[in-house]
Amino acid sequence: MHILDSFDKKTLRDDIPEFAPGDTVKVHVNIIEGKTARVQVFQGYVMGRQGYGVRETFRVRKVSFGIGVERVFPVHSPIIDKIEVVTKGDVRRAKLYYMRDRHGKAARIREKRADAK
């Protein structure tokens, strides 16, 4: 373990839920405009996660008014108010960059079924 890893451990957040590529998430982001602050919700599916520790990021994509919008969020950033997992997706890849070229029904992600036990 490096010296910086022990320093970074102090800044890691512990309120981040488990989510993976293909999951639909709502990211509540704190937006500060002048003197006012508000929370903006960005809902989309996770295209991938990369990095580790403080430097870990994830990419969320949504289609807004027919135009694809992607945002990259640092997982442990203080501008993120909270992350909600809406649905779990069933995908076979760690990075879903191929979804950029899909439109309509081809862009759907199967929902992971709960175990029937």
From Swiss-Prot:
BP terms from Gene Ontology: translation
UniProt keyword list: Ribonucleoprotein, Ribosomal protein
Family per similarity comment: Belongs to the bacterial ribosomal protein bL19 family.
Domain of life (superkingdom): Bacteria
InterPro entries cross-referenced by the UniProt entry: Ribosomal_bL19, Ribosomal_bL19_CS, Ribosomal_bL19_sf, Translation_prot_SH3-like_sf
Protein name: Large ribosomal subunit protein bL19
Role noted for this protein: This protein is located at the 30S-50S ribosomal subunit interface and may play a role in the structure and function of the aminoacyl-tRNA binding site.
Any single GO CC term annotated in Swiss-Prot or TrEMBL for this entry: cytosolic large ribosomal subunit
Gene3D superfamilies on file: 2.30.30.790
UniProt xrefs under NCBIfam families: rplS_bact
Entry keyword annotation includes Ribosomal protein: yes
Annotated GO MF terms: structural constituent of ribosome
Gene behind this protein: rplS
Coiled-coil boundaries: none
PROSITE patterns on file: RIBOSOMAL_L19
